């Protein structure tokens, strides 16, 4: 890949910046840590409240540069889908005072595992989140951390797709007293079976759900029947069970 010059990066900012909406779209440019470090030093990004960095090559070093950037201290939305952030980067995000206004965080298809999930769950900084996408190695234990968090209580949307979550993780979500505001739950590409689905179907936690996606989970006929018969899922408007 050709190394990007400062002129290249300035052009990307100019092309991706919507000053009126406070948005900066830098998705799909194969940006690496050094690239975003240079971008974050630019005065052009002052006033940005929504930053889209999906489909790049940003790792923990780039995250640290983002958190040190004075121009991004008013972010309300951060999309890091499909990058290379690990638990270490998530821990930095979780303890940062830069992101106190953040309401939307997308970190699916990164390298986040149990320690990252724990850091998110214990973060006062992220207590204003209403939308969280995280992955992709949480497993049942990571799901349990999210479920029991006393700070992630405002979530309307939670995406835990492709996280190796099984019945134990699904049951933990079902037992959560902190996720009752959820209207959208994405559990695609996991390993949840009928037992996990039955636990969810019996749970009052999910009475506000309007969208539930369970594509590529081995729930079987018993799991499908549990959903169909559940009074707690009566508000569903979208249900995806494709195997």
Question: What does each model-identified segment do?
Answer:
Residues 24-31, 51-57, 78-84, 95, ...:
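Concave beta-strand-loop units of leucine-rich repeat
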Residues 16-23, 43-50, 70-77, 97-104, ...:
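Leucine-rich repeat
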Residues 10-15, 148-149, 175-176, 188:
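A broad, low-specificity signal for short, low-complexity segments enriched in glycine/proline
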Residues 2-68, 75-77, 81-84:
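LRR N-terminal entry segment and analogous cap-like coil->beta motifs
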Residues 38-44, 65-71, 89-98, 116-125, ...:
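C-terminal per-repeat helix/turn "cap" of leucine-rich repeat
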Residues 3-9, 30-37, 57-64, 84-91, ...:
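Short, solvent-exposed loop/turn at the beta-strand->alpha-helix junction
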Residues 1-12, 21-24, 141, 168, ...:
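C-terminal capping region of solenoid repeat domains
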């Amino acid at each position: 890949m050709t190394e990007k010059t400062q002129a290249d990066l300035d052009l990307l900012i100019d092309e991706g910046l919507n000053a009126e909406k406070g948005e900066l779209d830098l998705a799909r440019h194969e940006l690496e840590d050094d690239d975003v470090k240079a971008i974050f030093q630019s005065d052009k990004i002052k006033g940005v409240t929504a930053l889209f960095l999906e489909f790049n090559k940003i790792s923990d070093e780039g995250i640290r540069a983002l958190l040190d950037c004075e121009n991004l201290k008013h972010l309300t939305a951060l999309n890091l889908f499909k990058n290379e952030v690990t638990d270490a980067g998530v821990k930095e995000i979780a303890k940062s005072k830069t992101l106190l206004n953040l309401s939307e965080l997308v970190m699916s298809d990164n390298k986040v595992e149990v320690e990252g999930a724990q850091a998110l769950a214990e973060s006062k900084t992220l207590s204003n989140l209403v939308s969280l996408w995280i992955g992709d190695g949480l497993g049942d234990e990571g799901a349990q951390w999210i479920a029991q968090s006393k700070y992630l209580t405002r979530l309307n949307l939670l995406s835990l797709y492709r996280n190796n979550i099984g019945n134990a993780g699904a049951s933990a979500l079902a037992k959560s007293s902190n996720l009752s505001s959820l209207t959208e739950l994405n559990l695609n590409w996991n390993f949840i079976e009928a037992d996990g689905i039955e636990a969810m179907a019996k749970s009052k936690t999910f009475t506000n759900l309007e969208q539930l996606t369970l594509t590529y989970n081995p729930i079987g006929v018993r799991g499908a029947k549990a959903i169909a018969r559940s009074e707690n899922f009566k508000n569903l408007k979208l249900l995806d069970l494709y195997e």
